[in-house]
C-alpha cells in the first residue's frame, strides 16, 4: 500500500524491512542496527541504473528513527527526511523524568517480540505490571525479551544508548527534515526539542528549510 502510494506520485518506492522481522534475515533487536542497514540500503540504491541522485525518506516511530540514523549522509544521495512521531532520543522517551515508561516500553516489547507483530492483550499487560521486579515484567506478560531487559537496566549507561540514539544527531543533520508530532504522543517533548536543536545548531540551509507540524493525534493509531 505504501509503495503504491508513492509510486503513483512518480517516485521509485523502496520499502526497507527491519533486520530479523518478517522476511528479513538476521537477529531482531530494535533500533540497534538501523544505521548499518540504512547505509547499506542507500549504497545499494546508488548502484541501480534508475537512480537519479535523489533519495527522500519517510517513516513513523521506529522507521523515523531509521531516518535519523543516516541523516548525516547526503553523500549517498539523501536530500530530505519526513519523520513522524519519533525523535533522536529513545532514551528520553523510555526514561522521561527518571522512571521507566512501562506502558510504552512493555507494550512495544510484547507486540514486536519475534519475527512478526502479535496482538497485545490487556490482560497480559495488567498481569505484568502488578508485581516487581520491573525488569521481569516481560516474563510475566509473554516471556523473556532481552531488549526489554536492556531498556530497563541500562538507563544510566551512556555507551548503550549512544549505540541507539547516536550523538547530537540534530547537530550533524545534513538535509532538511519535516517533523510531524502528536499532542498525545510520548515523543512530543523530544520532537519539539529536536526541532529547536536543528534550527539553532544545524547549518543554515538545513535549519531554514526544516519544519515541525503538531496535530491532535497519538502514536499507535497514526503508525
Residue ranges: model-predicted function:
Residues 1-3, 8, 71-172:
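Accessory cap/linker subdomain of secreted extracellular hydrolases
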Residues 1-47, 94-95, 223:
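Cap/lid segment of the alpha/beta-hydrolase catalytic domain
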Residues 9-12, 51-54, 76-80, 174-176, ...:
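Loop/turn elements at helix/coil->beta-strand transitions in domains of secreted/extracellular proteins
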Residues 49-62:
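Alpha/beta-hydrolase fold nucleophile elbow
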Residues 57-59, 84, 180:
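Short beta-strand immediately N-terminal to the catalytic nucleophile in serine-hydrolase-like folds
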Residues 153-223:
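C-terminal subdomain of alpha/beta-hydrolase-fold enzymes, centered on the catalytic histidine
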Amino acid at each position: 500500500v505504501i509503495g503504491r502510494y508513492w509510486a503513483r506520485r512518480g517516485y521509485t518506492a523502496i520499502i526497507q524491512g527491519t533486520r530479523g522481522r518478517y522476511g528479513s534475515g538476521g537477529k531482531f533487536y530494535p533500533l540497534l542496527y538501523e544505521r548499518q542497514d540504512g547505509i547499506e540500503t542507500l549504497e545499494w540504491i546508488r548502484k541501480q541504473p534508475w537512480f537519479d541522485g535523489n533519495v527522500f525518506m519517510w517513516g513513523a516511530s521506529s522507521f523515523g528513527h531509521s531516518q535519523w540514523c543516516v541523516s548525516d549522509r547526503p553523500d549517498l544521495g539523501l536530500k530530505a527526511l519526513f519523520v513522524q512521531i519519533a525523535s533522536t532520543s529513545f532514551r528520553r522517551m523510555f526514561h522521561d523524568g527518571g522512571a521507566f515508561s512501562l506502558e510504552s516500553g512493555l507494550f512495544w516489547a510484547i507486540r514486536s517480540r519475534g519475527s512478526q507483530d502479535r496482538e497485545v492483550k490487556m490482560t497480559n499487560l495488567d498481569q505484568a505490571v502488578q508485581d516487581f521486579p520491573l525488569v521481569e515484567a516481560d516474563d510475566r506478560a509473554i516471556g523473556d525479551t532481552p531488549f526489554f531487559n536492556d531498556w530497563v537496566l541500562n538507563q544510566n549507561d551512556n555507551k548503550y544508548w549512544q549505540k541507539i540514539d547516536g550523538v547530537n544527531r540534530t547537530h550533524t543533520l545534513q538535509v532538511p527534515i519535516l517533523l510531524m508530532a502528536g499532542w498525545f504522543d510520548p515523543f512530543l517533548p523530544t520532537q519539539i526539542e529536536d526541532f529547536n536543536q536543528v534550527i539553532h545548531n544545524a547549518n543554515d540551509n538545513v535549519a531554514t528549510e526544516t519544519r515541525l507540524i503538531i496535530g491532535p493525534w497519538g502514536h499507535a493509531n497514526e503508525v
